[in-house]
Amino acid sequence: ENNFATETEKLELGGSMRYNYRDADVVTVGSSQRFLQSGDSYSNSNKANSNKETGFKADFRMEWRPDSMTNIIFRPNVSYDKTRGASVAESGTFNEDPYQYVVNPNDYLNFDNIESDDPLRDTRINATNEHNLSKSNSLSANATLQLNRKLNNEGRNITFRGSFGYGDDDSDQYAQSETRYY
């Protein structure tokens, strides 16, 4: 965050700016066994998440005193935020321990990998592949203008104040999930 300020007899300026960026990737690999009376069940999963966020915010303040009876204050600000997210998840359930057949069952969870060659087909109960995407953008701009004039030295004033605001938000999401039973 950056701040600045300056002042003269008739003019006072100040403001700040902030920029933020975040990029996070998470990969999770799982394997579990359920102990059931009707027979054990085995599950394997892969998940990858990627999230990116960018943000910018700035505000400004100007106070002008053209004479001893008048002051004008102008305060604009703007902010922008952008986010992007993506995730891929693959999972499978088996009626026998898949490690009896292959070294890494998690290599056989993606539909593309098991279409032509599936060494776990005889023990596979189901497989699920999911894809999710999201994005959003947000922009806002605001400003306030105030004009103040003393009418006399006894404390009477007249003030005019106006404000402006603009906002634009947009977000999109996409999700696909497919489960196949064997």
Name every feature range the model reports, one short phrase each.
Residues 1-182:
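Primarily recognizes Gram-negative and organellar outer-membrane beta-barrels
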